[in-house]
């Protein structure tokens, strides 16, 4: 599983350590001793259910600091906002980097290039909640969503991908483009209308990975080189079933490992027992 560049991906975390959150956090730490990940991609909903009120909110301790306390998890964490963060103070999530040295969130959407042993990997982090109408139009529940400039983010995404020359490009955001779910279909159609054409435009995106649905899904659409991945919850999973394009799905909770070398990109879905239950392989 270890590559030139190795990353963790975890999302839909915040259960105050309950359910499987703490055991999975311990597993991530133990596996980290062998894999030596560069960082954790924290793809939204770090805090259920109403986000955080401030950088001093006790949820930072009960959902994050005291749970992900293994020495091997004292890494850079690169987060994105999920819909549950948008129920609270989203600026506090960005500002938490002034409190915790491992919280690396320079903006609501941003990009990071990893360069190691001659391999380059670009991760593009999206803020997907403001790209979806049902959040934009519900300011009572998601007060910060309507304040964001959708066009500016989409233009930034287009420009970022247009200029991306790395060996591999992965785009992550909280919401899926394709997935089995009983959540509103409009979430996916908005993502398909607004984000998908940009992802496909420059033919350099290998994987779009998300959370939100609380199960593992790997979807591949005919005529599309991008692999669409739903990463499960790292605390509490939900049932799943196959849909059009499903390569694999599982209702296990857990996390994922991304491994990159010059010619190969792999993503491993890990259950709470530490078993690899599915592997996505990309080659050049």
What are these regions (language model features)?
Residues 7-9, 40-42, 79, 171, ...:
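Residue-level marker for buried hydrophobic side chains located in beta-strands
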Residues 177:
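Active-site-proximal loop/turn and secondary-structure-junction residues that shape catalytic pockets
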Residues 274-276:
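Residue-level signal for glycine
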Residues 1-58, 180:
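N-terminal active-site segment of His-dependent metallophosphoesterases
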Residues 11-12, 44-45, 126, 173, ...:
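Active-site flanking residues adjacent to catalytic metal/cofactor-binding acidic residues
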Residues 4, 48-169, 184-207, 213-261, ...:
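Extended active-site neighborhood of metal-dependent phosphoesterases/phosphodiesterases
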